[in-house]
Amino acid sequence: MEDQRKYGAYGTPQKYDPTFKGPIYNRGCTDVLCCVLLFLAIVGYVAVGLIAWTHGDPRKVIYPTDSRGEFCGQKGTKNANKPFLFYFNIVKCASPLVLLEFQCPTPQICVEKCPNRYLTLLNAWNTPEFEYYKQFCVPDFQKNKKGVAQVLRDGQCPAVLIPSKPLAQRCFPDIHAHKGVIMVGNATTYEDGHGSRKNITELVEGAKQANGILEARQLAMRIFEDYTVSWYWIVIGLVIAMVLSLLFIILLRFLAGIMVWVMIVLVILVLGYGIFHCYMEYARLRGEAGSDISVLDLGFQTDFRVYLHLRQTWLAFMIILSILEVIIILLLIFLRKRILIAIALIKEASRAVGYVMCSLLYPLVTFFLLCLCIAYWASTAVFLSTSNEAVYKILGDSSCPHQGQTCHPETFFNSTEAHACPNARCQFAFYGGESGYHRALLGLQIFNAFMFFWLANFVLALGQVTLAGAFASYYWALRKPDDMPAFPLFAAFGRALRYHTGSLAFGSLILAIVQIIRVILEYLDQRLKAAENKFAKFLMTCLKCCFWCLEKFIKFLNRNAYIMIAIYGTNFCTSARNAFFLLMRNIIRVAVLDKVTDFLFLLGKLLIVGSVGILAFFFFTHRIRIVQDTAPPLNYYWVPILTVIVGSYLIAHGFFSVYGMCVDTLFLCFLEDLERNNGSSERPYFMSSTLKKLLNKTNKKPVES
């Protein structure tokens, strides 16, 4: 009755099918609608990229441009002798829009040199100093009969000049510290040109935002220099990581059992030592003044070291560690058989990888496709961000019929609008644009990010289905490897693309939706950081936590659904349901296997990354005497070391992702094998002899007539 209730809640066990011999070859296309939707989305994505490439100019990220979009210092232009960019009001560069649009929302002009003195327009007006001041006004500026107020309203001159220095062709305030006080030039405050004085810190904030991307550029140049002299040794380090990853996978085949049990024993010993240490501290504090005060009486203390002088603290630690120790020992006693099954599956996965060795190279295909996705997303994002244009508006008195309309400063004075409104002016308003394309820029950026998530998840899903199909053909071969197809990996790849593109698109679409929601929540969280609404912060934290958990669950469900797709060729929803029910019918085995394999793979990654990282550290810091003179001189020795560490992790992760997919595939096949077959001559088990021995299962020999 208990089994019936369990199977009723989570479906019924797989029934015996005499025609089933592994991955089904006669299958049809699944989730065709999602396949069409993916195709249309890709067409739209390409169109967005083409439009962005037409309007955008990535040179705006690197080279300075004035408010009219003209590059400073470019040969053959009127700004050829004006290499530096000057901001009218650099304080406005502290706006968050700078990061999104790569532009400060203030008029900008190209100048021959940066200002070297404090000077306001009001003080310079009608004095000889105005000749110096005029070079920082808009090109071809003439006083005529305008007053200071009108010039400032028209945005033709800055209100104030501040001592500045050029940095990456931009003029930034000459900020320095004197006896701990931030100064620009020789002052700590400045006149804003409107009769009031402001603190230097406002300039600092503006300069920080505008200067951030420039400092990153200089850093990038030094890093590039380091790569040019150390790339050879970085490649050698990555090759060592690849060799170590292969050796670890080979060792798992023979030493998986020993490694698992050694780790379990070490965990028990560490917890045991923790209990002993807590008891010794508890006994040592006996009789000491103040050690018997309870935690509740002491209350909350910001210095947590105070609690270590209380006996109650060590007693609590000892109780917690003792409970953990007892739980682990009880789990080992009652789950020892399932741990042995997990070890046997890991060994079996090593054999499967050995028979399908080309599977270890498949992560290179995934890596290449992901690089294409990242490159297209990044380039499109940059082109979209640099699509904004300087927008000018007509500003005049209330009687002007053209008030607020868009204008062009080059032609405004000869236009009908200027004749209709003699007192009007064409003034810089903002960076953006008023076309439908410019109004849709934010939406296009979100679509760009969403498509990146969708395509990246699709590439990962394609790899998982391909590997699952190859390893499933190994498990369901009764005589291994004789009954396996000639090229299992290529056959699985072809089936995945030919029949299941729609299913892969469906699964990756669900995951992409959750991921883009998480990105939007992160953006909103950043916007709410300055707010004091505690309820909003609490709600945002809960939402972020929920969607993080949802993403993890969907990834787990998708992974197992792709295995079922690779084996049976069913659509995504059917495969996800069948995989979920199969796992829930064997939930304890799933939990044990998942944790054992995760722990083993984590150990392997740490071992490989740690070994190669330590070797790289000693080499690039000239601490290995044998090759001390061989190591190249560097600006930042952490650049090649960090590259080797990250690269080693990616290589190890690539190898272990193949191994992990193999274990998961064999595990699902193993569970189905137990439900489908009974070991008779008509329904023999497909599992290895080691697994059959652990489960006390045997295949009965056919009765000879």
From Swiss-Prot:
Keywords, alphabetical: Antiport, Cell membrane, Glycoprotein, Membrane, Mitochondrion, Mitochondrion outer membrane, Phosphoprotein, Sialic acid, Transmembrane, Transmembrane helix, Transport
Tissue: Expressed at high levels in lung, colon and in supporting cells of the inner ear (at protein level). Progressively lower levels in brain, tongue, liver and kidney (at protein level). In the tongue, strongly expressed in epithelial cells and in nerves within the musculature. Within the nerves, expression observed in the perineurial cells of the nerve sheath, in the Schwann cells and myelinated nerve fibers (at protein level).
Comment field (misc): Antibody KHRI-3, which is directed against a N-linked carbohydrate of CTL2, causes hearing loss when infused in the organ of Corti.
Sugar-modified residues: 186, 199, 414
Keyword Nucleotide-binding: no
Subcellular location: Cell membrane; Mitochondrion outer membrane
Subunit (UniProt): Interacts with COCH.
GO molecular function: antiporter activity; choline transmembrane transporter activity; ethanolamine transmembrane transporter activity
Function, as annotated: Choline/H+ antiporter, mainly in mitochodria. Also acts as a low-affinity ethanolamine/H+ antiporter, regulating the supply of extracellular ethanolamine (Etn) for the CDP-Etn pathway, redistribute intracellular Etn and balance the CDP-Cho and CDP-Etn arms of the Kennedy pathway.
Modified residues (Phosphothreonine): 12
Source organism: Cavia porcellus (Guinea pig)
Family, similarity comment: Belongs to the CTL (choline transporter-like) family.
Name of the protein described by the UniProt record: Choline transporter-like protein 2
Modifications made to the protein after synthesis: N-glycosylated; contains sialic acid. Not O-glycosylated.
Highest taxon of source: Eukaryota
GO cellular component: a single term: plasma membrane
